[in-house]
Amino acid sequence: MKKGISFIVCIAIATANMYGQTDSLQVKELAKSHSKSYEVKSAIEVESLVPMFLTGGYHFAVGYRYERFRVRLSVINGGSYDAETAGVNNSSADFKRFYKTSPGLFLGYNLWRNLELYSYLEAHTFEIEQKSTGIQKDLHSLDTGLGLSYQFFIGRYFYVQPGMHVYLRSDKTIDFGTANYSIPNVDLSPVLRLGVRLWSQQK
């Protein structure tokens, strides 16, 4: 009789432990499923500067996040977007400036939650057009600068990331015969990116 009671007690204890472990696993899985978007250990994301498509161009970027750090590779073509209007110090009303297909490298750090401060290096090729003659010439510029933006997640995967970029570059001039074009040393440009988090690993 005592052996039978002892056996039943052992079974009850083992069953309770099993259910306790199952509940613990369920709690952990639930916590993971409700974790914040900025709490990931690592993630792979793809995104696009969607306004470029509205002007007949395109933009694609793929990024990898580790803890607070983020690296992105991008390619941009601005179509008919006139980037000369973004020039701060010496933009010219006599010329237009268009983004031709250009690559870029971005390195960022999350200051707080999804607020990202980043720097970049973009090997831009601009097509410069003189308005009065329609003559077009290419200008190559290695641009750097700073950006600040915030990822607003819609659910677990999709996000909208508005921000502001400050582009810096050295002096460059093109001779159009009747006039010289000097590219602005500083561009100030708002940006709006749409993205998808393809994969993530929780902390």
Question: Language-model features: where?
Answer:
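Outer-membrane beta-barrel porins/channels
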Residues: 170-179
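Bacterial Sec-dependent N-terminal signal peptides
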Residues: 1-27
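Gram-negative (and chloroplast) outer-membrane scaffold detector with strong preference
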Residues: 61-162, 198
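Short, loop-centered acidic/histidine patches that primarily coordinate divalent metals
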Residues: 163-167
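Outer-membrane beta-barrel "beta-signal"
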Residues: 152, 184-203
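Short glycine/proline- and aromatic-enriched beta-strand/turn motifs that initiate or cap beta-hairpins
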Residues: 21-88, 197-203
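Short sequence motifs at beta-strands and strand-loop junctions characteristic
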Residues: 40, 51-54, 95-100, 136-143, ...
